[in-house]
Amino acid sequence: MIKISKKDYVNMYGPTTNDRVRLADTDLILRVEKDYTLYGEEVKFGGGKNIRDGMAQSVSEGDFPDLVLTNALIVDYTGIYKADIGIKNGYIVGIGKAGNPDIQDGVDPSLIIGTNTDIIGAEGLIVTAGGIDTHIHFISPTQIECALYSGVTTMIGGGIGPSEGTNATTCTSGAYHIHSMLKATQNYPMNFGFLGKGNSSNKNALKEQIIAGACGLKIHEDWGATSSVIDASLNIADEMDIQVAIHTDTLNEAGFVEDTIKAINGRVIHTFHTEGAGGGHAPDIIKMAGFENVLPASTNPTMPFTKNTIDEHLDMLMVCHHLDNKIKEDVEFADSRIRPETIAAEDKLHDMGVFSIMSSDSQAMGRVGEVILRTWQSADKCKKEFGALKEDNDLDDNFRIKRYIAKYTINPAIAHGIDSYVGSIEVGKFADLVLWQPKFFGVKPKLILKGGLIVGAKIGDANASIPTPEPIIYEKMFGANLNENALHFVSKASLDANIPEKLSLKRKCVAVKNCRNITKKDLKFNDKVQDIEVNPQTYEVKINGELISSKSVDSLALARKYFMI
C-alpha cells in the first residue's frame, strides 16, 4: 500500500478527521469531526491530478452537478467536517464523496463528476453558508457590495434611501415603496427581504403592505411603539405567516418593558438590539432576551465590548435618530440608552446562548460589513475571558464555533421563515456559499457564491499574466451580472396576488413560511431561556442572583493586522 506523510496529505487535500485548525489570529480552534472524501479516492483538479475523463470524471452521460467544490472543510451548525459539495441549477444537490463510480468506491450518486461539471478546489479552505443580516436600513445601495464582500448574501430590513425615516427605522412604508424596492434591487447579487411599517393600529394598512410583497413588519419607537400597534402587527402576522421585528420604547412613553411583554402576549417576535444601546426600553429591555417567545438579536456596534464602545455611541445615536446636541432632552434621551453594565452583560449572554442572532443596523448605529467579523471577535474575546465552554474541551472549540456561526446563518433564517432556502449547508438549499482561507477566516473571504455562481472574489491586477499579482482587491465576478442566482423573500399573500408578475420582476420570489409556529427553542445552539433581572439603579444584570458581565478590552483579534489604516 502506498503511504503519504500527514504533512503532504494536508498540503494536497486539506485537513482530515481530528486535525485541528486555528481560525485566523483568534484562540478559536476547530477540529474536523469527520471526513467523507474517502482516503485514496479523493478527487482533485489540476496538472497531474485525477479529475480527468475516465478517471475521477465519468465518461457517462447523466444529470450531473454543474459545479463541485472538492475537499471542502465545512463549518456549519450541522457540523464541522470535510466533504465534496455538489451544486446543480443553483441548489446544493449533494454533500459527501464526489468522483466517478465506475472506478471509485463510495461515490455519492448525486456527486458524479461529468463533462458538464466545473470544479472549485476547496482543499485547505473553509466553506460556510452565506451570512444573513436581518437588520438593514436600506440607506444606500453601496451597502450591498460592502456586505457581500464580508460574506453576507442575504439582507432583510427596510428603507428607501437616506430619508429621515430610513436613517432611523428599518421600515419600507407602504405598497408604493415596497414595490419600488423590489424592482430597484433585483439586479444586485444579494437576496433581499423588505419589512413594512408595523406602526399602525389599522389592520388594513398593515395587510396592504404584506400583500404588496413585504416579508414582515417592523415596529420602531420613532414611529411610536405602542401596545396597540404591537397587538395589531402581531395579529396580522399570525394571520398571514410573517415575522414582526421590534425596536421598543426607549423613553417608556407608552409603557414599560412589562407593558410591551403584555402586549406581545406570548406571541413570537424578533427583538432588535435587545441590549438597548441601539434602542429599547431603558434600562431593562435586555430582560426580553430570556423569554421563550422572543428571538433576541444584537447589532454589532456593542459587540464585542471594548474601551471605545461607550464613547462612540453618543454621536452615532444623535445622528441616526435625528437628535440635536443643543437640545437638553435629546442629549438625555441619548444618554439613557448607553449603559456600560448592560453592554458588558451582552457579550456573556451571547456566549451562554441566551442571545441568538447577530446583525448590523447598517449605517444607523451599525456597520454592514462587520457582522461576521464582530461575531468571531466576540467568540474569541469570550474564550479569552471565560475559557472553554463546558460543552467543549481543551483541544477544540467546536461547540462554541457552532454557537457563533449559527448567530448569523441559520438562526436569522429561522426567525424570518427562510431557513428552507438559505442559512446552512444542506442538500436542497440555495447554494449561497463563502470560501475562506483559514488565516483570513471571518475577515476577508476568498470567494463568494450566490446560487452556485461566483459573484465576488479577491482578485489581482487584470493586466497581469496570472490572477494573483497585487493589488488584490474585491471585484464583482460574472455571476454578479445575473438575477436568477438571487432571491426576493416575500409573503405568500403577495405571491397569491401575483405581485411579482404585476411588477415584471426578473428574479425569483419565494414565500417566507413557518414564522409563527416557532420559539426560541427552535434556534440552533442559542436557545437558552433565563429569568434576567436588571437593577434599576445600578443597571447590573443578573441571572439567578449571579452577576452577568464581561470586561471591556483594549485589543481584539481580526483587527489591525488585517486592514490598512
Curated annotation (Swiss-Prot):
Provide the residue positions that the database annotates as binding substrate. Answer: H220
Q: Which residues form the active site?
A: H321
- Maturation and modification: Carboxylation allows a single lysine to coordinate two nickel ions.
Cofactor(s) demanded: Ni cation
Q: Which GO terms describe its molecular function?
A: nickel cation binding; urease activity
Note the InterPro entries from the entry.
Amidohydro-rel, Metal-dep_hydrolase_composite, Metal_Hydrolase, Urease_alpha_N_dom, Urease_alpha_subunit, Urease_AS, Urease_asu, Urease_asu_c
**What is the protein named?**
Urease subunit beta
Gene name of the record: ureB
